Protein backbone atom coordinates (compact mmCIF):
# COMPACT_ATOMS: atom_id res chain seq x y z
CA UNK A 1 0.00 0.00 0.00
CA UNK A 2 1.52 3.30 -1.09
CA UNK A 3 1.95 6.14 1.34
CA UNK A 4 0.88 9.71 0.59
CA UNK A 5 3.31 12.33 1.87
CA UNK A 6 2.00 15.82 2.63
CA UNK A 7 4.30 18.80 2.52
CA UNK A 8 4.52 20.38 6.01
CA UNK A 9 4.38 23.87 4.47
CA UNK A 10 1.01 23.01 2.92
CA UNK A 11 -0.29 21.95 6.34
CA UNK A 12 0.92 25.19 7.90
CA UNK A 13 -0.68 27.22 5.12
CA UNK A 14 -3.95 25.38 5.57
CA UNK A 15 -3.95 26.00 9.32
CA UNK A 16 -3.24 29.69 8.73
CA UNK A 17 -6.17 29.88 6.32
CA UNK A 18 -8.44 28.25 8.89
CA UNK A 19 -7.37 30.71 11.57
CA UNK A 20 -8.00 33.65 9.25
CA UNK A 21 -11.42 32.26 8.34
CA UNK A 22 -12.35 31.88 12.01
CA UNK A 23 -11.24 35.44 12.76
CA UNK A 24 -13.26 36.72 9.81
CA UNK A 25 -16.38 34.88 10.97
CA UNK A 26 -15.96 36.22 14.51
CA UNK A 27 -15.51 39.76 13.20
CA UNK A 28 -18.64 39.55 11.05
CA UNK A 29 -20.63 38.15 13.96
CA UNK A 30 -19.50 40.98 16.24
CA UNK A 31 -20.38 43.61 13.63
CA UNK A 32 -23.85 42.15 13.21
CA UNK A 33 -24.40 41.97 16.95
CA UNK A 34 -23.06 45.47 17.71
CA UNK A 35 -24.17 47.60 14.77
CA UNK A 36 -26.87 45.71 12.90
CA UNK A 37 -28.76 43.73 15.52
CA UNK A 38 -32.06 44.93 14.09
CA UNK A 39 -31.19 43.34 10.74
CA UNK A 40 -31.03 39.79 12.09
CA UNK A 41 -33.65 37.41 10.78
CA UNK A 42 -34.64 35.62 7.64
CA UNK A 43 -34.62 37.98 4.61
CA UNK A 44 -37.58 38.06 2.30
CA UNK A 45 -37.57 38.45 -1.45
CA UNK A 46 -39.28 41.67 -2.51
CA UNK A 47 -40.14 40.30 -5.96
CA UNK A 48 -42.48 37.73 -4.41
CA UNK A 49 -44.61 40.41 -2.75
CA UNK A 50 -47.65 42.05 -4.39
CA UNK A 51 -47.44 45.59 -5.73
CA UNK A 52 -50.13 46.85 -3.36
CA UNK A 53 -48.74 45.98 0.07
CA UNK A 54 -51.80 47.41 1.78
CA UNK A 55 -53.74 44.31 0.77
CA UNK A 56 -51.77 42.30 3.32
CA UNK A 57 -53.37 41.97 6.75
CA UNK A 58 -50.78 41.37 9.47
CA UNK A 59 -53.19 41.64 12.43
CA UNK A 60 -55.15 38.70 13.81
CA UNK A 61 -58.43 40.63 13.68
CA UNK A 62 -59.48 41.60 10.17
CA UNK A 63 -61.50 44.82 9.57
CA UNK A 64 -65.10 44.16 8.65
CA UNK A 65 -65.96 47.12 6.43
CA UNK A 66 -64.29 49.61 4.04
CA UNK A 67 -64.56 52.40 6.61
CA UNK A 68 -62.81 50.31 9.23
CA UNK A 69 -60.09 49.36 6.75
CA UNK A 70 -59.44 53.03 5.95
CA UNK A 71 -59.37 53.93 9.65
CA UNK A 72 -56.97 51.08 10.38
CA UNK A 73 -54.65 52.11 7.55
CA UNK A 74 -54.66 55.74 8.68
CA UNK A 75 -53.89 54.85 12.30
CA UNK A 76 -51.11 52.51 11.13
CA UNK A 77 -49.49 55.30 9.11
CA UNK A 78 -49.67 57.61 12.11
CA UNK A 79 -47.99 54.98 14.28
CA UNK A 80 -45.22 54.55 11.71
CA UNK A 81 -44.29 58.21 11.80
CA UNK A 82 -44.59 58.64 15.57
CA UNK A 83 -41.36 58.62 17.53
CA UNK A 84 -40.85 57.73 21.15
CA UNK A 85 -39.63 60.36 23.58
CA UNK A 86 -36.43 58.38 24.02
CA UNK A 87 -35.74 58.86 20.28
CA UNK A 88 -36.45 62.59 20.18
CA UNK A 89 -34.50 63.87 17.15
CA UNK A 90 -33.65 67.12 18.95
CA UNK A 91 -32.00 65.24 21.82
CA UNK A 92 -30.15 62.95 19.41
CA UNK A 93 -28.97 65.96 17.41
CA UNK A 94 -27.76 67.70 20.59
CA UNK A 95 -25.83 64.59 21.59
CA UNK A 96 -24.37 64.41 18.07
CA UNK A 97 -23.21 68.05 18.24
CA UNK A 98 -21.58 67.39 21.63
CA UNK A 99 -19.62 64.52 20.11
CA UNK A 100 -18.64 66.69 17.14
CA UNK A 101 -17.31 69.36 19.51
CA UNK A 102 -15.23 66.79 21.38
CA UNK A 103 -13.86 65.49 18.07
CA UNK A 104 -12.90 69.01 16.94
CA UNK A 105 -10.99 69.65 20.18
CA UNK A 106 -9.09 66.37 19.81
CA UNK A 107 -8.16 67.13 16.19
CA UNK A 108 -6.95 70.62 17.09
CA UNK A 109 -4.82 69.21 19.91
CA UNK A 110 -3.26 66.82 17.41
CA UNK A 111 -2.08 69.79 15.33
CA UNK A 112 -4.57 69.83 12.46
CA UNK A 113 -5.57 73.18 10.94
CA UNK A 114 -8.89 74.60 12.05
CA UNK A 115 -10.11 75.46 8.54
CA UNK A 116 -9.57 71.89 7.37
CA UNK A 117 -11.33 70.51 10.44
CA UNK A 118 -14.22 72.95 10.07
CA UNK A 119 -14.77 72.22 6.38
CA UNK A 120 -15.07 68.50 7.10
CA UNK A 121 -17.30 69.15 10.12
CA UNK A 122 -19.68 71.33 8.09
CA UNK A 123 -20.18 68.60 5.50
CA UNK A 124 -20.68 66.01 8.25
CA UNK A 125 -23.33 68.11 10.03
CA UNK A 126 -25.14 68.83 6.75
CA UNK A 127 -25.09 65.11 5.97
CA UNK A 128 -26.51 64.26 9.41
CA UNK A 129 -29.33 66.81 9.16
CA UNK A 130 -30.25 65.80 5.61
CA UNK A 131 -30.51 62.11 6.48
CA UNK A 132 -32.06 62.33 9.95
CA UNK A 133 -34.51 65.17 9.34
CA UNK A 134 -36.20 64.29 6.01
CA UNK A 135 -39.47 66.02 5.15
CA UNK A 136 -42.37 63.58 5.52
CA UNK A 137 -44.63 63.16 2.44
CA UNK A 138 -47.92 65.01 2.70
CA UNK A 139 -46.80 66.99 5.77
CA UNK A 140 -45.12 70.37 6.02
CA UNK A 141 -42.29 70.79 8.49
CA UNK A 142 -42.22 74.55 8.19
CA UNK A 143 -43.80 76.81 10.79
CA UNK A 144 -45.68 80.00 10.00
CA UNK A 145 -42.60 82.18 10.30
CA UNK A 146 -40.66 79.97 7.90
CA UNK A 147 -43.54 79.93 5.41
CA UNK A 148 -43.80 83.71 5.56
CA UNK A 149 -40.08 84.07 4.98
CA UNK A 150 -40.27 81.63 2.06
CA UNK A 151 -43.07 83.60 0.42
CA UNK A 152 -41.16 86.85 0.84
CA UNK A 153 -38.02 85.24 -0.58
CA UNK A 154 -40.00 83.95 -3.56
CA UNK A 155 -41.40 87.42 -4.26
CA UNK A 156 -37.93 88.92 -4.14
CA UNK A 157 -36.68 86.22 -6.51
CA UNK A 158 -39.41 86.90 -9.05
CA UNK A 159 -39.17 90.70 -8.86
CA UNK A 160 -35.40 91.12 -8.83
CA UNK A 161 -33.39 88.11 -10.11
CA UNK A 162 -30.40 90.25 -11.00
CA UNK A 163 -30.26 91.59 -7.45
CA UNK A 164 -30.18 88.04 -6.11
CA UNK A 165 -27.26 87.10 -8.37
CA UNK A 166 -25.37 90.20 -7.30
CA UNK A 167 -25.98 89.48 -3.63
CA UNK A 168 -24.87 85.86 -4.08
CA UNK A 169 -21.58 86.91 -5.69
CA UNK A 170 -20.95 89.48 -2.95
CA UNK A 171 -21.57 86.86 -0.30
CA UNK A 172 -19.10 84.48 -1.94
CA UNK A 173 -16.40 87.18 -2.18
CA UNK A 174 -16.96 88.14 1.44
CA UNK A 175 -16.65 84.52 2.53
CA UNK A 176 -13.37 84.15 0.66
CA UNK A 177 -12.02 87.42 2.09
CA UNK A 178 -12.85 86.36 5.64
CA UNK A 179 -11.12 82.99 5.06
CA UNK A 180 -14.30 81.12 5.88
CA UNK A 181 -14.74 77.36 5.62
CA UNK A 182 -13.98 76.18 2.06
CA UNK A 183 -16.86 73.66 2.31
CA UNK A 184 -19.26 76.45 1.28
CA UNK A 185 -17.67 76.60 -2.17
CA UNK A 186 -18.12 72.85 -2.58
CA UNK A 187 -21.90 73.10 -2.17
CA UNK A 188 -21.98 75.47 -5.13
CA UNK A 189 -19.76 73.20 -7.22
CA UNK A 190 -22.06 70.25 -6.51
CA UNK A 191 -24.88 71.93 -8.41
CA UNK A 192 -22.91 72.05 -11.63
CA UNK A 193 -23.09 69.14 -14.03
CA UNK A 194 -19.75 67.36 -14.22
CA UNK A 195 -19.63 64.56 -16.83
CA UNK A 196 -16.71 62.85 -15.11
CA UNK A 197 -18.58 62.77 -11.79
CA UNK A 198 -21.72 61.37 -13.40
CA UNK A 199 -19.64 58.79 -15.26
CA UNK A 200 -17.97 57.64 -12.03
CA UNK A 201 -21.33 57.34 -10.22
CA UNK A 202 -22.85 55.45 -13.14
CA UNK A 203 -19.84 53.11 -13.33
CA UNK A 204 -19.99 52.13 -9.65
CA UNK A 205 -23.78 51.69 -9.69
CA UNK A 206 -23.63 49.60 -12.87
CA UNK A 207 -21.03 47.28 -11.33
CA UNK A 208 -23.40 46.54 -8.41
CA UNK A 209 -26.67 46.84 -10.31
CA UNK A 210 -27.89 43.35 -9.43
CA UNK A 211 -26.22 43.09 -6.01
CA UNK A 212 -28.81 42.87 -3.23
CA UNK A 213 -28.43 44.91 -0.05
CA UNK A 214 -30.12 44.36 3.31
CA UNK A 215 -32.64 46.90 4.59
CA UNK A 216 -34.72 46.98 7.80
CA UNK A 217 -38.41 46.20 7.34
CA UNK A 218 -41.41 47.44 9.27
CA UNK A 219 -41.92 43.91 10.63
CA UNK A 220 -38.64 44.14 12.62
CA UNK A 221 -36.91 41.91 10.08
CA UNK A 222 -34.93 42.54 6.90
CA UNK A 223 -35.55 42.43 3.19
CA UNK A 224 -33.25 42.41 0.16
CA UNK A 225 -33.28 45.10 -2.51
CA UNK A 226 -31.09 46.15 -5.44
CA UNK A 227 -30.86 48.85 -8.10
CA UNK A 228 -32.41 46.56 -10.71
CA UNK A 229 -35.68 46.41 -8.76
CA UNK A 230 -36.06 50.18 -9.05
CA UNK A 231 -36.94 49.67 -12.73
CA UNK A 232 -35.42 53.05 -13.52
CA UNK A 233 -33.11 54.31 -16.21
CA UNK A 234 -29.48 54.44 -15.09
CA UNK A 235 -29.31 58.14 -15.99
CA UNK A 236 -32.27 58.87 -13.71
CA UNK A 237 -30.69 56.89 -10.88
CA UNK A 238 -27.44 58.84 -11.27
CA UNK A 239 -29.33 62.14 -11.30
CA UNK A 240 -31.11 61.30 -8.04
CA UNK A 241 -27.90 59.90 -6.50
CA UNK A 242 -26.18 63.27 -6.86
CA UNK A 243 -28.57 64.60 -4.21
CA UNK A 244 -27.06 62.29 -1.58
CA UNK A 245 -24.70 64.29 0.67
CA UNK A 246 -20.97 63.81 -0.07
CA UNK A 247 -21.62 61.44 -3.02
CA UNK A 248 -20.62 64.00 -5.64
CA UNK A 249 -17.42 64.80 -3.76
CA UNK A 250 -16.53 61.12 -3.38
CA UNK A 251 -17.15 60.53 -7.09
CA UNK A 252 -15.04 63.58 -7.96
CA UNK A 253 -12.17 62.15 -5.90
CA UNK A 254 -12.63 58.68 -7.41
CA UNK A 255 -13.44 57.19 -4.01
CA UNK A 256 -15.77 54.27 -3.35
CA UNK A 257 -19.42 55.28 -2.96
CA UNK A 258 -21.77 54.14 -0.16
CA UNK A 259 -23.97 52.24 -2.59
CA UNK A 260 -26.40 50.91 0.02
CA UNK A 261 -27.01 54.48 1.20
CA UNK A 262 -27.43 55.63 -2.41
CA UNK A 263 -29.88 52.81 -3.13
CA UNK A 264 -31.88 53.58 0.01
CA UNK A 265 -32.02 57.28 -0.88
CA UNK A 266 -33.20 56.70 -4.46
CA UNK A 267 -35.65 53.94 -3.54
CA UNK A 268 -37.15 56.03 -0.74
CA UNK A 269 -37.76 58.83 -3.22
CA UNK A 270 -38.92 56.81 -6.26
CA UNK A 271 -40.25 53.38 -5.19
CA UNK A 272 -43.65 53.08 -3.48
CA UNK A 273 -43.05 49.41 -2.72
CA UNK A 274 -39.79 50.26 -0.94
CA UNK A 275 -41.54 52.99 1.06
CA UNK A 276 -44.16 50.51 2.26
CA UNK A 277 -41.57 47.89 3.23
CA UNK A 278 -38.79 49.86 4.90
CA UNK A 279 -38.64 51.10 8.49
CA UNK A 280 -37.79 54.84 8.09
CA UNK A 281 -36.02 55.46 11.41
CA UNK A 282 -33.72 52.45 11.13
CA UNK A 283 -33.05 53.25 7.48
CA UNK A 284 -31.96 56.78 8.39
CA UNK A 285 -29.50 55.41 10.95
CA UNK A 286 -28.06 52.92 8.46
CA UNK A 287 -27.67 55.60 5.78
CA UNK A 288 -25.97 57.96 8.23
CA UNK A 289 -23.58 55.22 9.36
CA UNK A 290 -22.69 54.41 5.74
CA UNK A 291 -22.06 58.09 4.94
CA UNK A 292 -19.85 58.54 8.00
CA UNK A 293 -17.87 55.39 7.16
CA UNK A 294 -17.25 56.32 3.51
CA UNK A 295 -17.15 60.13 3.55
CA UNK A 296 -15.36 60.62 6.87
CA UNK A 297 -13.18 57.54 7.47
Curated annotation (Swiss-Prot):
GO biological process: microtubule-dependent intracellular transport of viral material towards nucleus; symbiont entry into host cell; symbiont-mediated suppression of host cytoplasmic pattern recognition receptor signaling pathway via inhibition of TBK1 activity; symbiont-mediated suppression of host JAK-STAT cascade via inhibition of STAT1 activity; symbiont-mediated suppression of host JAK-STAT cascade via inhibition of STAT2 activity; symbiont-mediated suppression of host toll-like receptor signaling pathway; symbiont-mediated suppression of host type I interferon-mediated signaling pathway; viral transcription
Description of post-translational modifications: Phosphorylated by host PKC and by an unknown kinase.
Feature: compositional bias, Basic and acidic residues: 140-157
Ranges where the record places region DYNLL1 and DYNLL2 binding: 138-172
Protein family membership: Belongs to the lyssavirus protein P family.
GO CC aspect terms: host cell; host cell cytoplasm; host cell nucleus; virion component
Gene symbol of the encoding locus: P
Region named Disordered: 137-198
One family name in Pfam for this protein: PP_M1
Keywords: Chaperone, Cytoplasmic inwards viral transport, Host cytoplasm, Host nucleus, Host-virus interaction, Inhibition of host innate immune response by virus, Inhibition of host interferon signaling pathway by virus, Inhibition of host STAT1 by virus, Inhibition of host STAT2 by virus, Inhibition of host TBK1 by virus, Inhibition of host TLR pathway by virus, Interferon antiviral system evasion, Microtubular inwards viral transport, Phosphoprotein, Viral immunoevasion, Viral RNA replication, Virion, Virus entry into host cell
GO molecular function: RNA-directed RNA polymerase activity
InterPro entries named in the record: PP_M1-like (IPR004259), PP_M1_C (IPR037199), RABV_P-like_C (IPR049506)
Modified residues (Phosphoserine): 64, 162, 210, 271
Span of the annotated motif Nuclear localization signal: 211-214
Function: Non catalytic polymerase cofactor and regulatory protein that plays a role in viral transcription and replication. Stabilizes the RNA polymerase L to the N-RNA template and binds the soluble protein N, preventing it from encapsidating non-genomic RNA. Also inhibits host IFN-alpha and IFN-beta signaling by binding and retaining phosphorylated STAT1 in the cytoplasm or by inhibiting the DNA binding of STAT1 in the nucleus. Might be involved, through interaction with host dynein, in intracellular microtubule-dependent virus transport of incoming virus from the synapse toward the cell body.
Official protein name in the record: Phosphoprotein
Bias type Polar residues, positions: 159-179
Amino acid sequence: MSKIFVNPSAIRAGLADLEMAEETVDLIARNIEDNQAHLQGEPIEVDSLPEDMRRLQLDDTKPSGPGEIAATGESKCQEDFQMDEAEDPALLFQSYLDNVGIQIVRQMKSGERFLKIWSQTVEEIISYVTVNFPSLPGKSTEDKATQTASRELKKETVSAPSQRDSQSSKTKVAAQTASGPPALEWSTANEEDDPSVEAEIAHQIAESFSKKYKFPSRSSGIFLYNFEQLKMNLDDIVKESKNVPSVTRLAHDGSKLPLRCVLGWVALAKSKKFQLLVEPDKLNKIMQDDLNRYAFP
